[in-house]
């Protein structure tokens, strides 16, 4: 996760994170990416059921009842363990988390245990009554997925009217005083809608958006050919940077982030070296605090059936199940080769990759997204094919 607005628009300084000792339990949510202890933010895909059928869904969700989901009591036991382990945030996701009737109860329980509770939703089922309940239980944030304006989004979601329904859900949350934001997965079919999405942020006073680079997992594994080319990715990031700057210059300081491609960090830094060298030095310090991709370290995932994964895109590999062992025990068990490798990946990347092994940004990006390397090359430790930096930019010939 790269905080575009924080870094490019200068809304965060290194001292902001240092003031809290970079302790994940003390840091405000907008500074968690700079924590030193990297206690995992945990995505709990609490259900596989969903009222939509998105073409890029990593969970391959459907609108049917699935067996073997963690019960309410099992969910509370998971939350107990996460809270005692020091996980600062639990992100309720799916499928569609609002289809579970016990979502408010579980979110309230997480808050009681001192965790921040957030949800990732398609927004279409959030009526005013549900928004009131979510506000009452102290939900910190509602992230609504929109992958384009109206027709583009509805095509992705597999339902006519999904865009308008999602906006209604977002408005209901706003009216109840819940912080909201958008989630947008970039690909060839919707990249042209990025300017309109920025317009929507301003028109609807939406304070946050995360732009996700495409990850080849679940139904998204069938969309490899729909991913942007490397040059198109650079152009998309340039556009996001430009529109973010313009928003801030107009007095609307929206929080803009990019997710799942950590070469965005060095790319932004190199851009600032030309535009504002003094700020570039501060940004490099912040990127060093961020430490790059955190799958298996600062981000984890628990499936609806209790399986533990390195993140929500690693569903094909489980480290264990919370029905058999606590998450905290599974997460710290280095007898699993992949878990141990993800926590100390640089030697493995240097042994197996070409570009990454020679890259001067490896300490900043941490090898980018391993699951994408595996999907394309069949090797977890190979180069991430979505890295758009040139050989000159990574210092390939200097190594």
UniProtKB/Swiss-Prot annotation:
Matching Gene3D superfamilies: Aldolase class I (3.20.20.70)
Cofactor(s) the protein needs: [4Fe-4S] cluster
Name the UniProt record assigns to this protein: Fe-coproporphyrin III synthase
PANTHER family: PQQA PEPTIDE CYCLASE, RADICAL SAM DOMAIN PROTEIN
Keywords, in A-Z order: 4Fe-4S, Heme biosynthesis, Iron, Iron-sulfur, Lyase, Metal-binding, S-adenosyl-L-methionine
Designated gene of the protein: ahbC
Pfam families: Fer4_12, Radical_SAM, SPASM
Any GO molecular function: metal ion binding
Catalytic activity: 12,18-didecarboxysiroheme + 2 AH2 + 2 S-adenosyl-L-methionine = Fe-coproporphyrin III + 2 5'-deoxyadenosine + 2 L-methionine + 2 acetate + 2 A + 2 H(+)
EC number from the UniProt entry: 4.1.3.-
Domain of life: Archaea
